[in-house]
Amino acid sequence: MGSPHIVFFNRSFYPEASAVGQLLTELCDGLVRDHGCRVSVVAGYPLVRADGETDTRRRGLVEHEFFQGVEILRSRGTTFSKASFVGRASNYVSYFLSASLAGLRFKDADVVVGMTDPPIIGLAALFAARRARAKFVMLYQDVFPEVARLLEDFRNETVNRLLDTTNRLLIRSADRVIALGETMRERLVHGKGADPRKVRVIHNWADCSEIAPGPKRNSFSLAQGLADKFVVMHSGNMGLSQGLECVVQTAARVKEFLDIQIVFIGDGVKKPTLESQVRSMGLKNVRFLPYQPKEHLAESFASANVFIVSLKRGLAGYIVPSKLYSILAAGRPYVAAVENACEVAAITEKYDCGLLAEPEDPEDLADKVLALYRDPVLCRRLAVNARKAALYFDRPRQVGAYYSLFRELAEARSET
């Protein structure tokens, strides 16, 4: 057979700033460039562009584009703030409807992949797969309704029951289910009834050729006044799942150490709340910086002495923070405020590349940050181990795992 045609359904894609959008963009680019696949994406319009620009393009119901050899069917939907349930629901449903129409165009797909942005988009992917008689894959970046149920702003049991029913249907219908780690695999098998023979674990990644250990004193740290500070950094989305209020409370506990600076880089629905919390507490050791362009990521990561990875209690196995892999690639130690039974904890313990703290416990998080602040030898050991671990999660290796799976499914389709 020739090169397989793979179709992805996911709202976030280039030039979206979200981690999932950037990961999907890198995956599609690798499948086209390194493996010769034909790749199409049914995407939405960006809510937040990675370049910080405002999206002013004409928005038809479905617009046809190409980016680095990837075909994009840009499906129109609302772009309200994700901070409210109504706004988020409107974004979900409007994109789902236009994406379902876009999916009617694919009659020759070999593999159709449904993702989880929004959590109902897998249904549109399933319909497209059945119409094209293609193999259907569900790729879980987040598992619903558990993620929504544990975030107090989005507790709606009627909606959550519908999401649970939808996900069980998608899992039963899928030829393969992709989980981001062993804990997520267990959640899908034992919690959702997935056939263990159909579940494949493929990790997220960082590109170790783009993000690598570098000197702390660089143009970014000098420009931001961070070169002579002990920088404790959170980089990426400031969303509902991380419990970042705990990080601000940690900043209050280390404020007497004048050279420690807590730095948030990125954006998200929780950023205004965190900024307000910092102002109300009168903290001078916390800074907020915007998303950095991809070409500046390596220097922004190198500016950190220590990173923080956090996840609210109860979300282990339902979300895997993708920022971990970039931290590993940068060769920096981190404190992971996560539950013990999760992918981040497993990687931390297996590779000895960070410290673990109790989730949503600012005192324990502060203790672990200070342990690294006071012990440069420990920091260096964890940093070296982090970079070694990153090579296992390098982008070409993980993209190759996706290609092998898609090729296997495409060949099986051609034989039927």
Model-derived features: where do they sit?
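Conserved donor-binding/catalytic core segment of Leloir-type glycosyltransferases
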Residues: 225-242, 248-251, 263
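N-terminal subdomain of nucleotide-sugar transferases
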Residues: 1-65
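A short, well-ordered alpha-helix in the C-terminal region of glycosyltransferases
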Residues: 364, 371, 378-392
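Nucleotide-sugar-dependent
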Residues: 242, 293-328, 333-346
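Carbohydrate-associated surface elements
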Residues: 45, 183, 205
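Nucleotide-activated donor-binding/catalytic signature segment of Leloir-type glycosyltransferases, i.e.
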Residues: 258, 265-266, 271-298
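Acidic anion/phosphate-binding donor-loop and adjacent secondary structure
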Residues: 189-190, 197-200, 206-222, 243
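Membrane-proximal helix-turn-helix segments that form the acceptor-binding/catalytic region
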Residues: 123, 127-131, 157-179
